[in-house]
Regions:
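C-terminal accessory regions
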Residues: 152-270
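Conserved flavin/dinucleotide-binding core of flavoenzymes
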Residues: 149
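Conserved helicase motor core of P-loop NTPases
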Residues: 1-146, 157
Length: 270
């Protein structure tokens, strides 16, 4: 996907012909005969994916005319799928941050279903929301001092006054990270995240929101990126028309940087 900031650095580096490039052709994330792989290839070719019957199938679609109804369905489904306590099994992805099916509203809704407030549950404020013990959170800035980085996913295990302690699964057992009052803003709820934020990650089960109000982001490369994050199952919630819009839209916004041309002018081969 294009970078959130200016330019298109990696694409320009490849286009310049001055950088060594390796193309990965073998799929290891999903089984070779997985419907996810088959549909990813179809999406890449500009064809509609084939949806299997039943929300629990390997590649399914649940349609809703009302976007808030779609968001509520996602929250209920997420709660059912993680009722056994495996909070890392499911990840909700969505193209945008705003609207009923955006990251912000979905995280508030999912928190209400999964980790509601109670009289004996401590919480601490973060921009636009609160954190409670048990919440799934994401580090949103690189913090070299704490050895945690943008995109790391963890779970709040303790709140002591204004301090928040988070367990990150990739760290050794007991090697927790504590955030003081001024550092808590480095965290945000992570029940739902943007497709951009999910790049490079994988999850057993992906629930993807695809609705028409996100039309500005409905592009083929975004849909392809989202469904290929899943190892076992994909559930798309929203509108088949939104999926079709994304499949048929292979035009990415042109970015003018001259980086490729500058690299081509260089006599050095990297």
């Amino acid at each position: 996907l294009p970078s959130v900031g200016a330019g298109s650095v990696l694409k320009d580096m490849i286009r310049s012909g001055r950088m060594p490039v390796v193309r990965l052709e073998n799929v290891f994330r999903q089984a070779e005969v997985s419907p996810i792989v088959r549909n990813a290839h179809k999406i890449n070719r500009g064809q509609m994916p084939e949806f299997l019957a039943g929300a629990d199938s390997e590649f399914a679609l649940e349609e809703f005319a009302n976007e808030q109804d779609a968001a509520e369905f996602v929250a209920r489904t997420y709660a059912q799928l993680t009722s056994g306590g495996d909070w890392r099994r499911v990840q909700v992805l969505t193209p945008m941050h705003k609207n009923p099916c955006g990251v912000q509203n979905l995280n508030k809704l999912l928190q209400k279903y999964l980790n509601p407030p109670s009289a004996n549950k401590l919480e601490v404020n973060i921009p636009g929301n609160v954190l409670r013990v048990g919440d799934k959170v994401m580090q949103i800035r690189n913090n070299y001092e704490k050895d945690v980085f943008n995109g790391d996913i963890g779970r709040v295990i303790k709140i002591d006054g204004k301090n928040v302690t988070v367990a990150f699964p990739e760290r050794p057992e007991g090697d927790y990270v504590t955030y003081a009052q001024g550092e808590v803003e480095e965290l945000q709820l992570a029940y739902a995240m943007s497709v951009h934020k999910s790049q490079g990650s994988e999850y057993p089960y992906v629930i993807l929101l695809m609705v028409q109000s996100h039309y500005i982001m409905l592009q083929r490369n975004l849909l392809y990126t989202a469904v290929t994050r899943a190892k076992e199952k994909v559930l798309i919630v929203g509108s088949k028309n939104a999926v079709r819009t994304a499949v048929e839209n292979d035009k990415t916004k042109r970015r003018y940087s001259l980086l490729a041309e500058r690299l081509q002018e260089s006599s050095e081969v990297f």
